[in-house]
């Protein structure tokens, strides 16, 4: 029978009053003994953290929904409304609901999410009526015995990373802390803490960047760490050493940078409950000061915990209205330590973000699979998210992506964030991807560069596709190859710089925008192809005239063909930019628009005097 203590084993140091109450079988006496001797004293929760009763709700979508788990969600929601640490009066009013729901477990044990809920109630609702508290302690201890003695049966199902952290890390730690009088409790808590520490090291780099494989369910993965840190602080325990605390703090900061102004995290599946309240609480328990940029950013978004409860725990119905360009980002910081951008080879992810302000411009790229994933937002409004698909054909034959991607260049400075990804399509063919996000000028540049070293290459076709979010409305310009996409109040202009501007002019490729994707296709008879796509979302340039064209690149008086170098010039209103990429190397400098350079790639702004001010320069 679940919840019985027939095989209970006590520590020699266990309080005799607690042991006698359990043996006597009187729940009221047991409840009084538990309140006095059987549970750790829990301190008052910080005002920066969400109510303790609501914290298990962060993980509800991590497990299969059942009538019992739905009832647990409702119960936790009601308890959370009673305060951060519900008092005796509030718990007396809710006691019947707790008892009624507890009766549903007389025949079978709870699943991990439900057990987490009951343990949370036991830890933070010690003011329950004595008889009910005793009954809850008895049942919860019975359910926890297999965890305490390490005899939990291995199930055939494969747990996701977030489920594994909760089941193998958080639950053993919580059980060990709450049932400290039982034999094996200390080892159990230590075992759980060890799992959590190892998972932090295994799934994050030394700077705290979580691995790209976690992004889809990142808040679900983070939640057990946050709750564990909160319980450890509330009970005066320490589950991390100094290095672990630093890593956890860094993880929280990196996760906050992945949060958009609409309250969702980049590349997530959207099913996570109240990620903003999770991240705010994470900042609190990780020790980020109130003046920290990440804390200020999250505070400016607004709370989602109340909305979570009102909507029955579904964050899909909690989405905020997009901010749009009406609310500008804060002035971009100049100090490197204040910039939220980061890149990690180990975690296979790059986070490009212009600042910590609400209404951020951001681009997150994950390169842990055969196709990189990309997530783009402008002024806090997400407009692209999903697989950044590519297709390359050499002499008409498809060359699939089969090798891993690596980040071969990363830079974050006062002008922009920049990343390069590279993969070998074959022994002779290389695909290079460039991403540049402007710090203050509100544009992003995406470039695919394909090169073949084979002299037999006579035809090269390449297509890249950028996945758009739901609700996109595309529109094609009447006379040029410019497209515009609109989502809410946000409008982006899309310029295929590698194609001729005028629609009536012949072009070796096409740009097509649908409700689902931006697809750029280009082709050449050479062995190298550069495919630049410039996306502008500046409100000031929304209706400005535009012109783009190729530029002449010379070396020692010789004009270079497209197989050796590619240069494009773009003008929008009074703003002009140059993009230059050298497909071949040379010990001599090359010249374009008066700029003499030895760099492989140059992205620069053309001033009113015709001078080139580099935004990004990349060595070969």
Model regions and ranges:
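Catalytic and substrate-binding regions of extracellular carbohydrate-active enzymes
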Residues: 288-498, 527-529, 603-620
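Short Pro-Gly-centered flexible turn/kink motifs
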Residues: 524-537
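Beta-strand-rich interaction surfaces with strong enrichment in secreted/lumenal proteins
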Residues: 435, 518-523
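Active-site/ligand-binding surface loops and adjacent short beta/alpha elements
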Residues: 489-519
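Terminal, non-catalytic domain-edge segments
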Residues: 1-41, 231, 235-238, 251, ...
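Aromatic-lined, polymer-binding surfaces characteristic
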Residues: 38-252
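Non-catalytic terminal regions with compositionally biased, polar/charged low complexity
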Residues: 538-620
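Ser/Thr/Asn(+Pro)-rich, low-complexity disordered segments
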Residues: 1-110, 364-366, 371-387, 400, ...
